[in-house]
Amino acid sequence: MSIELRRETVQYRDGANELEGFVVTPQSNALRPVVLICHAWRGTEEFDRERAEWIASLGYIGFAIDVYGKGRRGTDNSSCAALMNPFIEDRAFLRRRLLASIACASTMQGADPTRICAIGFCFGGLCALDLARANAPGFVGAIAYHGLFTPPNLGVQSPIQSKVIAYHGWDDPMATPDAVLAFATEMTAARADWQLHALGGTLHAFTNPQANDPSFGVQYRAIAAQRAYQGSEAFFREVFGE
């Protein structure tokens, strides 16, 4: 039996900054968990909206968040880097922006504010991990797909309360074996309940069907994406207590 879904664009703010997200909600009288979808370096695009549809088809609220600001999207590598780098360089700034998305999710109609999870792709994977590091209220799980593992260096990390899982292409040039080991060390030191799934023969951006530039280190790999998504569905059931 198919689930009836409601789709809407939502406006929210981080201080004076206007943000625009996309939400897909299953029609239900019960409160539903929320899964934030954190975009890659281009900003929110059709891929993220499709992920929100997938999340809603599982019975959860899918919320494709906006880190950059309403209407701010990259069109090439240079403009994408210009949008992303200020957040990479100032992780306190990024954390504030991400927590604005948590605040928005917590007050959505039909949302269960005690069961919020985030998934993210590339830069968005770093965002999902930063939400785990922030111990945001009601936050129970983070999934990073081909994410960046650079720690935020915002002082002493308190114990991470949510569960964490990373799906990593072993041949990803943007997350080297040294970075992977540092991530494992960081998560262990933070006493996180964490998992790392390394996928052999897999580059960066392996979930994105539009990624096809091995010389830049990015390439879609359908079997890797399928394995990651199947594992994610089990992870959702675990962290949401189903």
Language model region names:
Residues M1-E242:
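N-terminal cap/leader regions of alpha/beta-hydrolase-fold enzymes
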